[in-house]
């Protein structure tokens, strides 16, 4: 077998009559398998002259003629045909020589099968329901797709079309060719998945873009009620989320568990995706599944994030909720409100807000009493759910400090966007909630800081 693998004709001849040409190894492969797989014409000819069994299958059902088609050796395939090899033989998966050639883009083999052997009947489905055309699409064999010109876009057993197979495996050239050949775009398989959904689910960004540009609908739901936005939000693929949003993917679609893309991304801590969805204006009031037996109320994305202990995302969602409530109450405002402060719900690390953030920290950790932050939150129209979500993280005797600090930073976010005077607002609210001592200290420190800046 080693001699056949190396095309070592001298050794094969030296072994002479003592050579058992039909000996098999543990994989049930003979020397002919290795000679053919290595595209070793001389060794193949020698073995055929010694009356080797040309149709011997290995443990996977692969005969030498399969290997000739698989590795694209037309000369050796012809030798095997002349030696009487079974031309319709199939392996354990139902693959014949045409399937093998199609998978590996060996167009000359397929042309020989169709034109010389006159065996178009080999153009049939394997055990998975895939015809050679579909297999060529699945493996990105674009030249093969061009010569298999029969105009069909047949679905396989699970309903996957060639476009599904090419898209989910990331074969951009094949996807583009199939889009040119066929008018169909949004066929679904048995799971209700389109080619676009499968491409997105497998993070094939180039294919997703090609399909979207060709007019594929990103909002077709699967049997599980998922749109293409669900799997990419769950996996945290922010570039694909952005791409789908640019092509009008609906943000508020609920799957079978009534989860939106925001529920999934919030629960798994996908901060970048959460930011994109919040900026897209996702509905924050949507609740996931209500469990009737346990009488458990469905949760909003905020509740899901709080349960998952995703502190940053909890604060982002509260900021978004307060921001959109403010915008709704002030419809006269337009996008110019973001000219100085671009919209973001992430943590604020800007130098120009450093003093205000320092004031918020001192107030929360050194000046406010345990229930003071809640009184401020109530005055600033924080909802009960928002307050509860803040309280879900951190417990203990001094946890109110962290809770108050987070609440103040969330409040500051909207004040900055509204372009108010946060220091003045804070002073007035502290007076209203009975914290004159804290208010005076904050104002005095702010004045001293201002004087220091002027002197310097």
Predicted regions and their residues:
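Conserved ankyrin/ankyrin-like repeat signature
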Residues: 11, 42-43, 75-76, 108-109, ...
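Ankyrin repeat boundary/linker residues
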Residues: 25, 58, 91, 125-126, ...
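Ankyrin repeat domain, specifically the short helix-to-loop turn at the C-terminus of the second helix
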Residues: 13-20, 45-53, 79-85, 112-120, ...
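Ankyrin-repeat-protein effector appendages
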Residues: 151, 181, 214, 247, ...
